[in-house]
């Protein structure tokens, strides 16, 4: 491990990520915030060597003394306190950081980022990899595995079971840190709704064999700050293990281990020589024929005519054989379809790769937020055409009616767990533009009741009306009756739930499962009384187009790299 620089407390020594040619000594100041507002902090840019990591703990914040002080004051339910080291990141990207932590995409891990959006959405990326404990829920059994072994227990409600795990790591929110510093990262599959709503059945088939839910329990991770061009390596000090100093040092050791990985070059990862001769579109293996999907649309319209529902969202899945590495597919997808919610989840036996435009539910600072999205147009070729398309979209009565229906669903979902009179719609039917399309977007907010948690908010809002229909329960019953296979991760929730109780989840749209060399894509269409069966089928294919393009691009990238190198690495 060579010389480098890090952001450290004045007088401290620390290991960093810049090459020796850029390292040196010096001091710079910046205005403090949060608990440091009463003073100006000084940070040392320090030349370091591979000397003992215990000496480097001086650049860890809070210090052991501060942790002792905080531990004496916290509520008895608090089990952990986050500590961190801050590093410069002007020569890094979230992709390079992930490759370093995962040793070339060989270890399970996660990358959550926002490639497109405002500062609130896009400032931070969250990256982790290593020997995390894993949480898998399948057939009513929760399995928690770590380096010491596995434990199992029976559950009735997956979110209640998840809450019990999180309670053992409970932390207080720290205003000086980003909103996510550790917790569970993963997905809650669509069929989990059967645990909350017993009336909802499930489709007969199970083509993917995924668990009901899967999460990494991430107590150490990297928070990448795009605005400050810095990284925080965060871990958690356990307060319930007797020896506080030993617990603090264990957290420092985890930070040191992660920092050490950040010092090196991003490793290459294994690529497979192409064996697929056919174009991607000629490798489609749908689980539903076009004729069958049109029949599903007509069946839904009969239910609408009978007064059972107003709208329903049947879907189809397409499987595609591919030699492309899942991480190359993710790298391609983030360029093909930049979105507010970009995610790569590696669970070893399967990967979840997605670029979702739509928030499911967020809980932050006591506020629940839901973002209904309905109504879509492509971006214009010119600024004038773009404006015209937006005006045409917002004036479309059918699109407006569907959107208002979803806003009402969102108000009902949030209202079930919000304080009386607190539900509001701060944004109603605004055009929001993305890289390739524009949508009608609204926001629904409410103050979470004091006796409830973020998991209660997720339960109330899950799944989104965007992927089910209205009324939601009856629409889901019809989906279970009509669709060929269970949905699995598709239409579920992807994101994180923080040890401090915060949460940010998106709907698993524009998402694929990659397992055993097969990429599985899924999309649905919102069927109403006057929908065209042909049009709805075409819409499902259109929604998968960015995913197909990502696979095509990933295969081309890998084959080009292999041709140039004559080897098997990127």
Positions of PLM-derived features:
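Short linear motifs in low-complexity or flexible loops
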Residues: 6-8
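Extended alpha-helical targeting/anchoring segments
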Residues: 45-570
């Amino acid at each position: 491990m060579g010389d480098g620089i890090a952001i450290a407390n004045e007088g401290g020594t620390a290991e960093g990520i810049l090459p020796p040619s850029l390292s040196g000594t010096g001091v710079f100041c910046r205005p403090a915030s949060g608990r440091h507002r009463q003073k100006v902090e000084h940070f040392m840019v320090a030349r370091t060597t591979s000397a003992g990591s215990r000496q480097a703990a001086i650049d860890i914040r809070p210090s052991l003394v501060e942790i002792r002080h905080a531990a004496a004051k916290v509520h008895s339910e608090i089990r952990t306190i986050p500590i961190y080291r801050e590093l410069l990141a002007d020569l890094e990207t979230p992709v390079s950081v992930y490759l370093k932590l995962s040793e070339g995409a060989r270890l399970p891990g996660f990358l959550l980022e926002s490639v497109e959006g405002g500062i609130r959405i896009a400032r931070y990326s969250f990256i982790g990899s290593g020997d995390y404990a894993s949480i898998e829920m399948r057939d009513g059994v929760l399995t928690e595995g770590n380096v010491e072994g596995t434990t199992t227990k029976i559950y009735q409600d997956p979110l209640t079971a998840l809450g019990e795990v999180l309670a053992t790591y409970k932390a207080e929110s720290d205003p000086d840190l980003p909103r996510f510093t550790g917790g569970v990262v993963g997905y809650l599959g669509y069929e989990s709704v059967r645990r909350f709503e017993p009336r909802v059945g499930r489709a007969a088939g199970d083509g993917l064999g995924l668990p009901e839910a899967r999460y990494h329990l991430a107590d150490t991770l990297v928070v990448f700050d795009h605005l400050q061009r810095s990284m925080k390596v965060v871990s958690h000090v356990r307060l319930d293990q007797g020896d506080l100093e030993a617990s603090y040092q264990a957290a420092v050791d985890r930070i040191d281990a992660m920092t050490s990985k950040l010092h090196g070059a991003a490793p290459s990862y294994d690529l497979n020589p192409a064996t697929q001769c056919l174009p991607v579109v000629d490798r489609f293996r749908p689980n539903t024929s076009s004729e069958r999907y049109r029949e599903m649309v007509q069946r839904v319209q009969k239910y609408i005519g009978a007064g059972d529902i107003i709208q329903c969202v049947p879907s189809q899945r397409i499987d595609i054989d591919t030699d492309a590495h899942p991480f190359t597919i993710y790298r391609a997808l983030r360029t093909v379809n930049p979105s507010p919610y970009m995610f790569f989840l590696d669970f070893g036996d399967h990967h979840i790769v997605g670029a979702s435009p739509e928030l499911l539910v967020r809980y932050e600072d006591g506020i629940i937020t839901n973002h209904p999205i309905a109504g879509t147009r492509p971006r214009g070729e010119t600024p004038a055409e773009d404006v015209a398309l937006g005006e045409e979209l917002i004036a479309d009565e059918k699109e407006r009616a569907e959107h208002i229906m979803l806003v009402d669903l969102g108000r009902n979902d949030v209202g079930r767990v919000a304080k009386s009179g607190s539900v509001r719609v701060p944004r109603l039917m605004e055009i929001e533009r993305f890289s390739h399309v524009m949508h009608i977007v609204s926001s629904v907010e409410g103050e979470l009741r004091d006796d409830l948690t973020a998991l209660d908010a997720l339960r109330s809002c899950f799944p989104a009306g965007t992927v089910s229909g209205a009324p939601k329960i009856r629409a889901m019953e019809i989906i279970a009756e009509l669709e060929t296979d269970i949905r699995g991760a598709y239409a579920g929730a992807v994101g994180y739930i923080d040890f401090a109780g915060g949460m940010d989840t998106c709907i698993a749209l524009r998402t694929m499962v990659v397992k055993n060399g097969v990429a599985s894509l899924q999309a649905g269409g919102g069927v109403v009384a006057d929908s065209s069966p042909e049009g709805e089928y075409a819409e499902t294919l259109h929604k998968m187009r960015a995913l197909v393009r990502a696979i095509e691009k990933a295969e081309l990238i890998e084959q080009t790299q292999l041709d140039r190198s004559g080897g098997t690495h990127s």
